[in-house]
Amino acid sequence: MAASVENRQFRHEPGLSAAGVVRSFSPNHRRSDSPIRNCNYPAAAREFMTPKKLPPETYDTSDDEEDEADYRDAIKKSNSELESSVFDPRDQGTADQWIERNPSMVRLTGKHPFNSEPPLNKLMQHGFITPDPLHYVRNHGPVPNATWEDWTVEICGLVKRPARFSMTQLVNEFPSREFPVTLVCAGNRRKEQNLTKQTIGFNWGAAGISTSVWKGVPLVHILKRCGIYSRKKGALNVCFEGAEDLPGGGGSKYGTSIKIEMAMDPARDIILAYMQNGEKLSPDHGFPVRMIIPGFIGGRMVKWLKRIIVTTPESESYYHFKDNRVLPSHVDAELANSEGWWYKPEYIINELNINSVITTPCHEEILPINSWTTQRPYTLRGYAYSGGGKKVTRVEVTMDGGETWNVCTLDHKEKPTRYAKYWCWCFWSLEVEVLDLLSAKEIAVRAWDETLNTQPDKLIWNLMGMMNNCWFRVKTNMCKPHKGEIGIVFEHPTQPGNQSGGWMAREKHLEISSELAHPTLKKSVSSPFMNTTSLTFTMSEVKKHNSADSAWIVVHGHIYDCTSFLKDHPGGSDSILLNAGTDCTEEFDAIHSDKAKKLLEEYRVGELITMGYSSDSAASSPNNSVHGATNYLTLHLSLATIKEIAPTRSVALIPKEIAPTRREKIPCKLISKTSVSHDVRLFRFALPSPDQVLGLPVGKHVFVCATIDDKLCMRAYTPTSTIDEVGYFELLVKIYFKGVEPKFPNGGLMSQHLESMELGSSIEIKGPLGHIEYMGRGTFSVHGKQKFARKLAMFAGGTGITPDLSSDASYLKDPEDDTEMYVVYANRTEDDILLREELDAWADKYSDRVKVWYVVAKSIREGWKYSEGFITEDIMREHVPEVSEDTLALACGPPPMIQFAINPNLEKMGYDIKNSLLVF
């Protein structure tokens, strides 16, 4: 059904007192009762209803009082027919699991952090005021679990009277303003840019926009109270800083700044907001206090506000420079970093630009063509907005590519401020003849504001994908919704997040396919009602192809048959099989290069039918990944002699043999962190149930998954804990800090994220993955084929010791396993040797079975009795067994070590590295 925007003119009730719309507060995060719902005030809130004596310069709120009844009526309407928020299962195991959220919100960055927008048609159905649960959300990390009583906001820097205000002081000691403001993310409509060329941002659709009635303290009053200095004394910028601890820049708060002229301008209506739509802020929207800067992008409106600092330079926050910029189109990520484009002030975004969107017809809406529909006009609808308080004065629609334009009817539901500013979106509509739609190939819209700014015809790409405001185009196609009847199906350019659909996605993949000259690919469509010869499948059909006999995956709405690639996949066949029969868009994008993405096109067999289907990735369902199933039953039987595990003991990583369609990410909470050295940490993570074992076969590893800087990051790790540990597993991780290694100035993304994690926060794991599995007593399974050895030449470099360690531990626990292990372990210095105590203890206790030899690039202590330099042929001949039928070599370490030291020297020793070398 087409989305519609009702005509909701405000009623004017001049007799309503100011107290009639004051909202109550409770000291916790749950939404308080409100007089809008005819509820009684709690005693603690009565202080807010008592008129306060204000200084003579207090802002005159008489106009606000006249509008309050209008706001109340609009809020009531917007909240009607809104489903309740719930504790979403997708938040379980994350730092946000205590927050209730609306289940219809479209998640854009997986499970965590929570970045979301409402379905576009649902957003418009609620009209001018957006219900708080449907307001778009932009979070960079976990939501602070704040309390009203303990929260303070510090004012410092270039002020005469630095102060720290409690929430009670902000409410009682300052005048307040309450008025509607439209908030828009600078990334609104970014997915259109990503489908032109990938940016560094995630996929916002066209619903990264919302309007609320905000109430708070004018910033200018707070700065005056604290005695802000003049420009002559260096006060040039006002910086805002939030409470959350974020990974950006190696660890920082979210912060930004505006010029002092903006901060002190009463016409800007900048407030410290503590109420939204008549109630205290919800956690996702900044409880207990946030900035509202009307007419600006949402990225300047710091949530969970903790500090306001008046400074000479602009904010030095990582997020002030590395976010919310529109760089020239030729600047890519490498150039931006190498030439310092992030720090050029002319590319910062403050005020919104002019923009408009078609919301009716909605995506994949079908208009039947019959005697009834052709006798009456069809109404096109949408929204428009501009920045800086500029009024939208005109919206035009074209159905012939811009040759002619039709002027639309505008519906401005707000009154101008006393400074003639317009802070909210407006709605537009246009009646068109259905016969005109029949002849149109597309419908496009553009808006104008009072300074005659308008939207460009074509998209202008930029690295961050921000401020996209080209004409919004809806394509039309003929279809047959019912037998003997024709209709028009409408197609929006994109669908938000990793949802499939949209004419831009279809054209993008057709373009790629044309470049690859794929002979069998037909034109694809996203609607099942179109009369077409292309192969389309439902998700239920895809799920049937979840085995080695037929392994299908879905990526960006396109279906790929990877069966023939199983044997060639670098990560082994189970790297694909764990994913077979699922939509793995998010995780595929997280770990694959552009080369791999182009290679994937060779295996495309059709398109996913998207109508009525929400992809697993878009919904952050746990059943998406890119890697690995394992033969758990064989492992369990083969290693039963190591240690008996109760038959009823559950495992966290459920094997494919037991649950072929279950491929879940497992949330695991950090319960301890031990510093092993200056850059090595031992992390212990709790499994979901205290009586579980991890269930990871020896030799396999897991993916650790986290959303970092709004993108899914996945890294493979081998736990150092033994397979029979109950309730937890451990990871030994080397932290690659920013600014230490010149070749990698930004350091390790995942390792720094793990380092920044607080106890109680969570990551997700998925697996098992890997093509090598130790079955016990000298037997390995490699790509499903068995190999046997009595002697193992084991080479490790740096953190590559962890797979060897897990293997060693399992060998030594089985008294019947007489496999001999010869370990050569390379590091930079003695201090970099991991788990040396364990290795030396094993070599001492099992001297007939375990030999360990260390190699360091440079010794930093006297008396070093092992090798110095690199692994050489002489070292290998002296410390690993000669080639024989019952000898295997195992290696895990940096690629240069394996390529230039291990491989050539093993060949010199007579090893067949193709068949006798296993690389983890």
Swiss-Prot record:
Residues 1-69 are annotated as: Disordered. GO terms for molecular function: FAD binding; heme binding; molybdenum ion binding; molybdopterin cofactor binding; nitrate reductase (NADH) activity; nitrate reductase (NADPH) activity; sulfite oxidase activity. Residues 534-609 form the Cytochrome b5 heme-binding domain. PROSITE patterns: CYTOCHROME_B5_1, CYTOCHROME_B5_2, FAD_FR, MOLYBDOPTERIN_EUK. Pfam families: Cyt-b5, FAD_binding_6, Mo-co_dimer, NAD_binding_1, Oxidored_molyb. The gene is NIA. Nitrate reductase is a key enzyme involved in the first step of nitrate assimilation in plants, fungi and bacteria. This is Nitrate reductase [NADH]. GO terms for biological process: nitrate assimilation; nitric oxide biosynthetic process; sulfur compound metabolic process. Residues 60-69 have a biased composition (Acidic residues). Mo-molybdopterin binds at residue 185. Its EC number is 1.7.1.1. Binds 1 FAD per subunit. Binds 1 heme group per subunit. Keywords: Disulfide bond, FAD, Flavoprotein, Heme, Iron, Metal-binding, Molybdenum, NAD, Nitrate assimilation, Oxidoreductase.
